[in-house]
Structure formats: C-alpha cells, structure tokens
C-alpha cells in the first residue's frame, strides 16, 4: 500500500540534514535566489541503482539544491512518484514523465528513466518522435508555453545508454550516438540533456558534442568519477553527464554528490540562461 504523505514527511524530517547525502559545499548550486520564471535552472541527474537510493534520500538532495529538473535512471514509477510528493511537500511541485515504451527493450520496465520537471515551467509534453533510441529508458519533453515569459525554456532529454561490453559494443555505440545526435539536430538550439551515458568524456562517442557542452566540465567537475562509488572520486569514471546548448546555457556551478543506496554519484549543475 502507498504510504501517506504525512508519514513520508515525518520520515523525511527524521532522517536529518546529513544522513544519506553528502554534497560538496557549493553556494552557486545551493542558492535560494532564483527568479519566478527560473532563468537560473538547477539540474540533478542520478542513477538510483534499481531504486536502491530511497525516495527520501533522493528528495532530500533535490530539495537541498533547489532542483528544477531531476533525471532518475534505474528507477521505478513508485520511487519517482514519492520523490515528487516529497518535493511538492517542500514547496517544489514537479510534473513526472516516464520513459517512452520503445526505449525499454533492455529493461524489466519496472526500472526505467524518469524525468521530473518543475510545474513552474508550465506544461511540458513528451515528444516520442525525437526521443533517442535507447534500451534502458529515455524520454524527451518539450515546453508548450510559447509566450515571452517562457521563451527561454529548453527541450529536455533524459536517457540511459546500454553498458559497453564485448557482446553489445555495437548496441552501446548506437545508443550513445542517438543521445549525441540530439546535440546535432534542430532541438540543440535550446537543449538540456542528462543521464547515465555509460561513457566518459574521452570516449570517441562524446568527442563531438555539436552545439552542446558538458556543464560539469565547464566548472572542472567533468573528470570527477561518478561510478562506482566504492572507489575514491579520482579513481572512478565520469559516466553520468549533463549536456546543455552552449549558445544559451552557461554553468554557474557544478558538483557531484554521494548518495546512499546507489553505486553512482549524483551530478548537479546550476545553469544561467542568456540570449544568443
């Protein structure tokens, strides 16, 4: 049975400020001074390791940095829904988007890639036709508000690329190219894309990101290991990424965070919008 929001709220309060989550101090990420229309956007991406990271822990991190966009891979619908409920309870209501079904060929479908977007951005809708062809979950959403106040809003992509191995190298290359191609198409003019790419910045597939830039690399966080967490950060590999259109989005700050229950570190960035 689904837990009541009151019970979840109590658990959220009991867990305290330091349990389960450690974020490097970074004032440019954890800022409360965002305008109503959010031209400064905070993005968080986390592989929750088959929902090993609890909704309380995930929501605590998202709320602590004021996340406007949250990408969760290897996550159940139930986990994401509880994260959204906890964020709403903290004053950050979110709209939730599940993976496009055709992108779940390699998944049990219980665990997928789910995207949360602030309701203060107005209505977003899934665009299946431009969603990358992955097998562990992907979704692309586009803004429906076209008035001047929302003109800056980006197309948002969340995806999880299949892991590279001897038997599936071709599949990995195909799926990685599908994600990278988003930065070479018309949607790249104003794009935020994040997720578990299962590739480092030094893999050939990420060598040419077209109209995009790695938001973490802009602030020298791009080489910090995000997986596996049992290795120190300098020894891990940075396979979780946030890419943005370099003509519109500039990185004000970025960091990675240790999150209990998952073998991945979360990646976070605060972005500032500018006209071309």
Regions found by a protein language model. Name each.
Residues 14-61:
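N-terminal signal-anchor transmembrane helix
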Residues 42-48, 58-84, 116, 156-159, ...:
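Active-site beta-strand/loop signature of hydrolases that rely on acidic residues for catalysis
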Residues 94-116, 200-260:
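Active site of divalent-metal-dependent phosphoester/diester hydrolases
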Residues 43-51, 164-171, 227-231:
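Acidic/histidine-rich helix-loop elements
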Residues 119, 130-136, 140-145, 161-162, ...:
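Aromatic/acidic, Gly/Pro-rich catalytic loop(s) in extracytoplasmic/lumenal soluble domains
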Residues 2-15:
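Single conserved hydrophobic/aromatic residue that forms the stacking wall/gate
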């Amino acid at each position: 049975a689904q837990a009541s929001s009151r019970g979840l709220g109590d658990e959220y309060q009991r867990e305290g400020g330091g349990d389960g989550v450690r974020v490097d101090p970074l004032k440019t990420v954890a800022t409360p001074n965002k305008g109503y229309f959010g031209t400064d956007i905070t993005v968080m991406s986390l592989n929750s390791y088959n929902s090993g990271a609890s909704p309380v822990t995930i929501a605590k991190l998202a709320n602590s940095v004021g996340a406007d966009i949250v990408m969760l891979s290897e996550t159940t619908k139930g986990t994401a829904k509880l994260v959204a409920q906890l964020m709403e309870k903290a004053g950050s209501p979110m709209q939730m988007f599940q993976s496009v079904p055709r992108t779940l060929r390699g998944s049990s479908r219980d665990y997928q890639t789910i995207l949360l977007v602030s309701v203060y951005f107005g209505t977003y809708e899934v665009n299946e036709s431009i969603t990358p062809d992955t097998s562990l979950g992907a979704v692309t959403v586009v803004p429906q508000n076209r008035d001047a106040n929302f003109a800056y809003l980006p197309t948002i992509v969340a995806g999880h690329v299949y892991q590279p191995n001897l038997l599936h190298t071709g599949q990995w290359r195909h799926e990685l190219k599908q994600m990278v191609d988003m930065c070479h198409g018309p949607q790249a003019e104003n794009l935020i894309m994040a997720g578990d790419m299962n590739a480092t910045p030094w893999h050939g597939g990420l060598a040419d990101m077209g109209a995009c830039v790695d938001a973490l690399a802009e602030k020298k966080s791009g080489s910090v290991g995000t997986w596996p967490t049992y290795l120190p950060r300098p020894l891990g590999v940075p396979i979780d990424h946030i890419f943005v259109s370099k003509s519109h989005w500039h990185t004000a700050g970025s960091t990675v965070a240790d999150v209990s229950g998952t073998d991945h570190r979360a990646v976070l960035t605060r972005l500032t919008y500018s006209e071309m």
